[in-house]
C-alpha cells in the first residue's frame, strides 16, 4: 500500500522545497500548458533565441525523463523528423518519440543508441542529464561533469558537420575544462542561463554549433 506523505512527515528543508515548487510560476505554467516538467521552458527559451531545432531534423535527447524536452523536440521536427530519447528512468510514451531506457554511463546503452540511429546523421544532441545528488558538492560536481563529457563524446560520434549540441552543466570544479572541450569541438559556443533556471542554481547551458572535429 502506498504511504501518503504529509507535511508532518517532511523535514523542514523538504517542506520549504515543496512550498517553493508549488508556488513556482514555471511549474504552474507547465501544468496549465501540458508540459511534463518546468524544464520545458529552458529549452523553449533557447529555441526562441537560436532556432536550433527545425522541421525534419534528427534529435537525440539525453536525460530525457519525464519528457518535456522530447515533447518540444517532437513538435518542432514534425512527422518527417526523428526524436530519440534516453534516460535511466522510465518515461511515458510520446507520439513519434523513440525511447531507450538505460544508464548512459554504460557502454551497452551507448551502443544501443548507435544501433537505433543505424548510421543516420544527427542534427542536434540535447542533454539535460544530471546525477542523483548526495549534497556533497565535491562528489556531485565531478559526476555531473562526467555525464557532460559522455554526452559530448556521443555528439562527436553522431553529429554531422553542421551539428549542434546543447548541454546542461553546473559551474564549479571542472567547468572551465569542459567548456574548453566544447570550444575545441564547435565553431560557435554560446552560454545561456534561461529564466526558468532558479537563481541560486549553478546550472548553465552550453550551446555548440557547427561541429568541427573529434576530441583528441
Curated annotation (Swiss-Prot):
HAMAP family: RNA_methyltr_E. The keyword rRNA processing applies. GO terms for cellular component: cytoplasm. Belongs to the class I-like SAM-binding methyltransferase superfamily. RNA methyltransferase RlmE family. It comes from the Bacteria. It comes from Acinetobacter baylyi (strain ATCC 33305 / BD413 / ADP1). InterPro entries: RNA_methyltr_RlmE, RNA_MeTrfase_FtsJ_dom, rRNA-MeTfrase_E, SAM-dependent_MTases_sf. It is found in: Cytoplasm. Its EC number is 2.1.1.166. NCBIfam families: PRK11188.1 (NF008390). The active site is at 168 (proton acceptor). Keywords: Cytoplasm, Methyltransferase, rRNA processing, S-adenosyl-L-methionine, Transferase. Its main location: cytoplasm. S-adenosyl-L-methionine binds at residues 67, 69, 87, 103, 128. GO terms for molecular function: rRNA (uridine-2'-O-)-methyltransferase activity. This is Ribosomal RNA large subunit methyltransferase E. It catalyses: uridine(2552) in 23S rRNA + S-adenosyl-L-methionine = 2'-O-methyluridine(2552) in 23S rRNA + S-adenosyl-L-homocysteine + H(+). The keyword Nucleotide-binding does not apply. It is an enzyme of class 2 (transferase). Specifically methylates the uridine in position 2552 of 23S rRNA at the 2'-O position of the ribose in the fully assembled 50S ribosomal subunit. Signal peptide: none annotated.
Amino acid at each position: 500500500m502506498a504511504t501518503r506523505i504529509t507535511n508532518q512527515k517532511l523535514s523542514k528543508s523538504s517542506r520549504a522545497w515543496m512550498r517553493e515548487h508549488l508556488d513556482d510560476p514555471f511549474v504552474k505554467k507547465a501544468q496549465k500548458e501540458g508540459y511534463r516538467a518546468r524544464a520545458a521552458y529552458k529549452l523553449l527559451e533557447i529555441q526562441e533565441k537560436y532556432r536550433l531545432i527545425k522541421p525534419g531534423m534528427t534529435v537525440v535527447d539525453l536525460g530525457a525523463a519525464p519528457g518535456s524536452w522530447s515533447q518540444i523536440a517532437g513538435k518542432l521536427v514534425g512527422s518527417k523528423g526523428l526524436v530519440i530519447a534516453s534516460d535511466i528512468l522510465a518515461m511515458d510514451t510520446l507520439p513519434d518519440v523513440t525511447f531507450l531506457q538505460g544508464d548512459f554511463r554504460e557502454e551497452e546503452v551507448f551502443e544501443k543508441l548507435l544501433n537505433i540511429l543505424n548510421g543516420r546523421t544527427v542534427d542536434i544532441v540535447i542533454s539535460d542529464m544530471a546525477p542523483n545528488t548526495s549534497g556533497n558538492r565535491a562528489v556531485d560536481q565531478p559526476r555531473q561533469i562526467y555525464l557532460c563529457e559522455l554526452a559530448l563524446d556521443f555528439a562527436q560520434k553522431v553529429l554531422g558537420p553542421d551539428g549542434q549540441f546543447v548541454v546542461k552543466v553546473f559551474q564549479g570544479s571542472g567547468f572551465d575544462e569542459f567548456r574548453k572541450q566544447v570550444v575545441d569541438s564547435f565553431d560557435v559556443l554560446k552560454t545561456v542561463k534561461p529564466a526558468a533556471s532558479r537563481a541560486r542554481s549553478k546550472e548553465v547551458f552550453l550551446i555548440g554549433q557547427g561541429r568541427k572535429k573529434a576530441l583528441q
